[in-house]
Amino acid sequence: MTRPRLVTGARLRYDEVREEHQLLIPEGVVRLNASAAEVLELCDGERSLDDIVGALAARYEGADLRDDVLELVDAMTQRGLVVDAA
């Protein structure tokens, strides 16, 4: 995958009542932790995986996030929630 993006019809939101991040899809709602939501916000079809990792590394100085980002994007791809924009 070169430039991940959310599948058409999916959108991220924060539910203030439940105090949780959610990925809204036509089939329902996927609950997300804050880290997953932050990664998926960067999956806009414009950024490469390296760009996403770089943006997060800049926010969290010294953290090695590459494996975690790749694992999340892969899991979301397998579920059909993230696709390649390329």
What feature does the model see in each segment?
Residues 28-86:
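Long, charge-rich, low-complexity alpha-helical segments
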Residues 1-41, 85:
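Acidic, low-complexity/disordered tracts enriched in E/D and polar residues
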